[in-house]
């Protein structure tokens, strides 16, 4: 497939998912916090699996990075009040304050752009970092709020259930994506060979997420995953 056509398909799929979440939140079918986390969880695997449509040419990663870049620019414009988009504000903010988009969601988009350009599908390091951000950190808030469990002594805002969900959510999502990449021939198999290194990445990301880095865990979790990835892959 042409890299330009792959980019068009990726952009359409990503925007359709975001608009679906905006619509659901605006209709009141789910609260804004849940919508925000569903966007957090779902965007990553959708985007990374779209990489498989791209041919192995140098321009592919740059064109692919345009998708999160354009969406991140939109986040910034909405957060700054330059563009009015009440549906997006409701879906991506905790309290309805557009300025919240300039923190977590903006950092989220920036990490996607950087990791796409630096690692792309040529490296095993980038995908676990993104999946720990999505499947780990994203699921933690939902599980932590719904499952009653003891709080962490070193971080009272975090819970045991939330931290366990970071580990297992990120691990499972990473292995799921790796399995598809192995099946598609993009990564060498078997997928079981990735279990141990992904476990180390998930453990490190879980420890970092358990610390109280308010509003910047969208940076700290993938960065920690990248550092560990360099050691284990």
Put a short name on every predicted segment.
Residues 14-17:
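Glycine/aspartate-rich loop-and-adjacent alpha/beta segment that forms the canonical ThDP
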Residues 1-5, 19-63, 76-176, 180-231:
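Interhelical loop and helix-boundary elements at the membrane-water interface
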Residues 66-75:
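Selected alpha-helical membrane-embedding segments in polytopic membrane proteins
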């Amino acid at each position: 497939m042409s890299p330009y056509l792959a980019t068009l398909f990726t952009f359409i799929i990503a925007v359709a998912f975001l608009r679906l979440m905006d619509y659901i939140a605006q209709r009141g079918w789910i609260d804004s916090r849940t919508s925000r986390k569903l966007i957090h969880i779902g965007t990553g695997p959708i985007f990374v699996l779209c990489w498989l449509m791209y041919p192995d040419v140098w321009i592919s990663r740059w064109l692919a990075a345009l998708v999160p870049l354009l969406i991140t620019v939109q986040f910034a414009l909405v957060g700054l009040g330059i563009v009015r988009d009440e549906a997006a504000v409701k879906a991506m903010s905790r309290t309805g304050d557009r300025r919240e988009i300039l923190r977590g969601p903006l950092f989220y988009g920036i990490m996607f752009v950087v990791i796409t350009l630096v690692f792309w599908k040529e490296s095993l390091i980038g995908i676990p970092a993104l999946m720990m951000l999505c499947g780990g950190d994203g699921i933690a808030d939902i599980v932590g709020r719904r499952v009653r469990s003891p709080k962490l002594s070193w971080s009272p805002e975090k819970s045991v259930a939330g931290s366990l969900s970071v580990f297992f959510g990120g691990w499972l999502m990473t292995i799921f994506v790796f399995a598809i990449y192995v099946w598609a021939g993009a990564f060498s198999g078997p997928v079981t060979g990735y279990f141990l290194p992904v476990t180390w990445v998930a453990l490190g990301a879980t420890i970092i997420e358990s610390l109280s880095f308010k509003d910047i865990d969208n940076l700290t979790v993938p960065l920690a995953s990248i550092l560990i990835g360099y050691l284990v892959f």
